[in-house]
Each structure stands twice: as C-alpha cells, then as structure tokens.
C-alpha cells in the first residue's frame, strides 16, 4: 500500500549515525509499508540533513500503536518542559490550568 501520507518539517538538533553525530535540517514523517522492520504498514521517521551526503539520515520504523504512544510521551514531556521554562526559568507565559465547573 502506498499511502502518500508524508509530512516534512524543518528540524533543529542532532542525530547519530554510527559513531558520529550530524546536525539536522529536516524531519520527515510518513505512513507506508515497512522497508526494514518485519511489520505491515508503519510510521516512518527520518531525521536528515539535506546539505550533507545522502547518508546523513537517521531512520525509524514504528507500528502505528507505538507511534501513538510516542506522541503521547512527547506531549507529556513537552508540557513539562513548557512548565519548566515558564515557571522555573521565567521564559514565556506560565501555563493556565482550566478547572471544570
């Protein structure tokens, strides 16, 4: 199945390939059949540097369920980091907690 589900975003950070780290320029998220994992359709994450050689890539293939769990973990970590930045370091507005009536 070729789904043509592809999202590309700029990325700032570092990725490791073998023993070496390289700077990132982009991240690609796709949903398609696995190329390497012995799985069906997968979420593929590719972290790349478009200016370096084609091997400047770190790729991951995840089941859809694992990708959802990773997204939830990222959401929790990002929320905690936002709180840390606002509350502890005084950067940005403090998060607002809305209580149900």
Cite the ranges covered by each PLM segment.
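Positively charged, low-complexity terminal tracts
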Residues: 1-101
């Amino acid at each position: 199945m070729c789904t043509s589900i592809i999202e590309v975003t700029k990325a700032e950070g570092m990725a490791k390939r073998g023993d070496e780290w390289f700077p990132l320029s982009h991240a690609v998220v796709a949903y398609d059949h696995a190329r390497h994992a012995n799985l069906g359709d997968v979420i593929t994450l590719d972290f790349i540097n478009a200016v370096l050689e084609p091997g400047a890539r770190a790729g991951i293939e995840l089941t859809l369920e694992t990708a959802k769990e990773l997204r939830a973990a990222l959401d929790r970590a990002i929320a905690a980091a936002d709180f840390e930045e606002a509350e502890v370091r005084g950067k940005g507005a403090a998060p607002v907690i809305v209580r149900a009536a």
